[in-house]
């Protein structure tokens, strides 16, 4: 009778185990893309890749690189401003569901990189000269990040982020909205 009861209990609890996600030292590679400052993607876009390493409380360290381009209108043409940045930051887990399918993070990051205005060309087609120059950037970002796990190794991500960078002539603040895919590698 005890064996029958044990088999019955085991049969009823099969499939009830939660997924083991965001365990300490797990790592994931993320690729993302988005738009900047509420402009259409043809005028302002960003993309990047990052490596996340999870800590014991489900939070994560993030290290990555990003490309951001915003086109500014001038007469009949546009002037591209491109930023290449490296990021290092900590994202604190704010919320998760019981099945560990949805995670919400808030994070802060340090950023450093380079900004190119019109790819270094200061003379425009109509003879005007740009006073903004290429420069090195430094600053930080505040991020709200969401991960929705599609399987144990694949997650859909979304983020909203505000970047604040100094050292440039073209504006300090940029708001980014993006989506991405994350692959857990170990």
Located regions from the model:
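Outer-envelope beta-barrel architecture signal
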Residues: 4, 21-29, 57-61, 100-106, ...
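Residues that define the transmembrane beta-barrel architecture of outer-membrane proteins
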Residues: 25-27, 41-47, 78-86, 102, ...
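Short glycine/proline- and aromatic-enriched beta-strand/turn motifs that initiate or cap beta-hairpins
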Residues: 19-70, 182-186
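Gram-negative (and chloroplast) outer-membrane scaffold detector with strong preference
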Residues: 52-125, 183-186
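Cleavable N-terminal export/targeting peptides
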Residues: 1-25, 186
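Extracellular loop and loop/strand-boundary signature of outer-membrane beta-barrel proteins
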Residues: 34-37, 73-79, 126-132, 164-168
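Membrane-embedded beta-strands of outer-membrane beta-barrel proteins
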Residues: 47-51, 86-88, 142-144, 148, ...
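Predominantly the C-terminal beta-signal and adjacent terminal strand-loop region
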Residues: 68-70, 145-186
């Amino acid at each position: 009778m005890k064996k029958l009861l044990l088999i019955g209990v085991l049969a009823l609890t099969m499939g009830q185990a939660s997924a083991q996600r965001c365990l300490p030292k797990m790592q994931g590679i993320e690729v993302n893309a988005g738009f900047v400052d509420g402009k259409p993607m043809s005028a302002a876009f960003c993309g990047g890749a990052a490596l996340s390493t999870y800590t014991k409380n489900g939070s994560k360290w993030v290290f990555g690189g990003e490309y951001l381009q915003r086109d500014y209108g001038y007469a009949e043409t546009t002037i591209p401003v491109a930023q290449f940045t490296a990021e290092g930051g900590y994202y604190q887990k704010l919320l998760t569901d019981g099945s560990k399918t949805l995670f919400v993070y808030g994070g802060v990051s340090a950023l450093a990189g380079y900004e190119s205005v019109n790819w270094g060309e200061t003379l425009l087609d109509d003879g005007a000269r740009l006073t903004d120059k290429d420069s090195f950037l430094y600053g930080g970002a505040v991020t709200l990040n969401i991960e929705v796990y599609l399987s144990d190794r694949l997650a859909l991500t979304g983020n909203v982020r505000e970047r604040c960078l100094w050292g440039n002539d073209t504006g300090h603040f940029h708001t980014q909205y993006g989506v991405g895919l994350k692959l857990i590698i170990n």
